[in-house]
From Swiss-Prot:
Name of the protein this chain belongs to: Large ribosomal subunit protein uL1
Pfam families: Ribosomal_L1
Its biological purpose: Binds directly to 23S rRNA. The L1 stalk is quite mobile in the ribosome, and is involved in E site tRNA release. Protein L1 is also a translational repressor protein, it controls the translation of the L11 operon by binding to its mRNA.
CDD domains: Ribosomal_L1
Gene: rplA
UniProt family annotation: Belongs to the universal ribosomal protein uL1 family.
GO-annotated biological processes: regulation of translation; translation
Length: 229
């Protein structure tokens, strides 16, 4: 354990469930690394992800962005390819990009957007893009003819969240350099979206536990009841 981590851990009471804003203040205070740490949110939900009707996923545009430069690859042709380039896509192409991904194991991008007519090409990449969470999806707005809008939202700080096999949602809230106020705004936007995405078939307590942490900092537990206030 590093000295800085031990110092940071002293500021956090492991047995306390903090109010959300108090937790954000603490996460900023405990971010002591030399680099700009990412602040992560982990929410354990009262759902059974094995059932299709209890999947929790969605997208939310963070009011203050993620602080991360997002590299976007767009599968499009003709005018839509030009539109993507004009809107700031990092890579634009069709079959040749699919071949590059398959043959070179190339993944220098964070998000993939595709026009619907390109899904025949993109579909072949399901096995490699799927496990990395990179497969375009109409629900998350990444399969669309409106590529300019999709790109603008992604670059502005749109994040996708989804529950994993253990019923936990892991999602970035921003960077520690944002300061407490901006992180609080992002945190509340994320929690509102996750709460609204509650499946109708979910029984009992929906938000079971909530925790915040920076990349190198200790976990800070949040009172799940206070999140719903």
């Amino acid at each position: 354990m590093g000295k800085k981590y031990i110092e940071s851990a002293k500021l956090v009471d492991k047995n306390t469930l903090y109010a959300p804003d108090e937790a954000v203040d603490l996460v900023v205070k405990t971010s002591k690394a030399k680099f700009d740490e990412t602040v992560e949110l982990a929410v354990r939900l009262g759902v059974d992800p094995r059932h299709a009707d209890q999947q929790v996923r969605g997208v939310v545009i963070l009011p203050n962005g993620t602080g991360k430069k997002v590299r976007v690859l767009v599968f499009a042709k003709g005018d839509k390819a030009k539109e993507a380039e004009a809107a700031g896509a990092d890579y634009v192409g069709a079959e040749e990009l699919a071949t590059k991904i398959q043959s070179e194991n190339w993944f220098d991008f964070d998000v993939v957007v595709a026009t619907p007519d390109m899904m025949g090409v993109v579909g072949r990449l399901g096995r490699v893009l799927g496990p990395k969470g990179l497969m375009p999806n109409p629900k998350s707005g990444t399969v669309t003819f409106d590529v300019a809008k999709a790109l603008t939202e992604i670059k502005a700080g749109k994040v996708e969240y989804r529950v994993d096999k253990t019923a936990i949602v892991h999602v970035p809230v921003g960077k520690s350099s944002f300061g407490a106020e901006k992180l609080k705004q992002n945190f509340h936007a994320l929690m509102d979206a996750i709460v609204k995405a509650k499946p109708a078939s979910a029984k009992g307590q929906y938000v079971k536990s909530v925790a915040l942490s920076s990349t190198m900092g200790p976990g800070i537990k949040i009172n799940p009841v206070k999140v719903l206030d």
